[in-house]
Amino acid sequence: MKVQSLLRIETQLLLGRLLTRSGDQAWDFVVPFALLVIFPGKLQVAAFYYLIVKIGTFLLTPSSGKWIDTHPRIQVVKWGVWLQFFAILAGMVFFGMLDGLVRAGGRESWLLSVLFIALALSGVMASLGSQITDISVGNDLAPSLVAPEKLTHFNSWLRRIDLATEVGAPILAGALFAFHPEQLPLAGLFLIGLWNLVSFVPEYFLLRNVIQRSGLKIKVLTEAQSWKDTFHINLRGSFSDPIFWLILSYALLWLSVLSPHGVLLAAYLKDEMRLPETEIGLFRGLGAVFGLISTVSFPYLVRRLGLISSSRWHLGFQGVTLGIAVTAFAMGSTASVYVFLGCILLSRVGLYGFSNGEFELRQRLIPEGRRGELNSLSSLTTTSATLILFSAGSLLPQTEDFKYLVYVSLAAVLLANVVFIKWSSRQGVVTSGSENLYFQ
């Protein structure tokens, strides 16, 4: 009997998620270090690389959503996984060529720019493939295959995997990257790339097995389109859908710099607050730990209050804790700094809990034929918020002006509460199987 047949569908989906997330997190963690090995002292090179990746993903996201809706599940999974595979493989090749060119004294060569752009484009393709796979697994296969009464529990395990890989994969990747022969400084990068490539193979066969053996009916496809039509985006239609306001409430949270994992906040704590790196690192690690609490609190409140009410409580908790955090921040004393950081950590329970709720609401409410379109819209809005936030940060004349971003962040979270309450108050009751989820 094959090993795959011994695993439940939910377990196979979670295992696939673990494989792809661990590889993604490890690769993303070491790419800027590898760029700094090739271009020492040139932090702007790494920043420019990620800017290209973000903008490229932003531009291709709506089209990828339309493409998902017009193609069979097995084809979507195949393209998502193998697009990542060949993009990472290309990235390894371009890194090797860049390193060789620089070592040979070719810093002024036109080929250097060409190879860097090629490397960045491979990053765009890897990001796009990851996004396609995430939407396919989390937003299409999961709501189609997991029993409605088990969906909250399943999503909690998805979140645990995401948080575990967010913490664990960079630690392992950092250890691999640090140990290398003197003559081959990118050996760690290539090992991590190989780890990624190997992980894609079982991931693909797991997901293919899930689709083929689950008895899942053929996906309701929207009308097939030409490639030209796929790139013609009707955002007005997506924005007019009622689900947009749910998506917007979550996207507003991405306009916040009040995150343990935020690079802007970390820079401020180091430059203005003079906190040591060890304390900043501990703060970052505890952010994931507090996020794990939501994987227990959210399902508990769903059982007691319902999906919408649990989401409201968690989002409200984030607003209250950040309100206290910003008040402490405004005081400016040494003690208030730690109150500020402590409340940010507490707010992660609310943030991750609401994230679970918003994710499950999209799973339950978006019709099958529009899952690609509307879930890619969610990615589009969060990416837009990230670009807006970093653009605002780059315009700050002095580090001390970071305080304005802190106040804007609180306003964005409070606005998210207003938008979500207004949207959810119109939902009434959603029936899922034999269970009613009362949106109170």
Question: Where do the language-model regions lie?
Answer:
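Juxtamembrane intracellular "pre-TM" segments in multi-pass secondary transporters
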Residues: 1-10, 209-250, 271-272, 438-440
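Primarily residues marking transmembrane-helix entry/exit sites
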Residues: 3-14, 43, 112-120, 226, ...
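Substrate-agnostic recognition of the 12-TM MFS/MFS-like secondary transporter fold
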Residues: 12-29, 49-68, 72, 76-84, ...
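Short amphipathic helix-loop junctions that connect adjacent transmembrane helices
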Residues: 29-44, 143, 263-280
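Transmembrane alpha-helix termini and helix-breaking/packing motifs in multi-pass membrane transporters
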Residues: 32-39, 96-104, 167-195, 299-300, ...
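Multi-pass alpha-helical transporter architecture, strongest
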Residues: 60, 94-96, 195-208, 322-329, ...
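C-terminal ends and interior cores of transmembrane alpha-helices
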Residues: 82-112, 317-333
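C-terminal transmembrane helical hairpin of 12-TM major facilitator-type secondary transporters
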Residues: 309-354
